[in-house]
């Protein structure tokens, strides 16, 4: 299957290099490039399998792009790709939800990192769906338990009324019998 990849990159040569490394790594990809915040915002209305982002963009940064993507509720795998990225920025990117970061000088890691990020995202989504299904099942179980408890209480009340009526009726008959005996005894 062909992956849909959004690439935030302002340099044509770097974009071509990323596309070449994806293909060299065996990834069939339809790669769409944007280089500014407005185009990114428009592109985020589509569904993507992977987002790759340069760190330094004109008037914009890869971290700002990541924040925008996450604030829109998009949980697409995100890899920061940059010519120069310090450890602090890499750590901040990972804390903000990036799946990985790569230096442009080490693009041989791009295809494996992309596949790993996509698989991790699929696993995360499957876990979320399973957690949601489990939560739904637990809620149904709670509702059934409450219904069962209410049914038990209703049945107990009905049995108690029936016993009360039977015993009450029996006692009334005994009272009548005793009254009759007392009236007719010497």
Each predicted region: which residue ranges?
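Hydrophobic pocket-lining residues within nucleotide cofactor-binding pockets
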Residues: 37, 57, 185
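Helix N-cap/capping motif at the beta->alpha junctions
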Residues: 33-42, 62
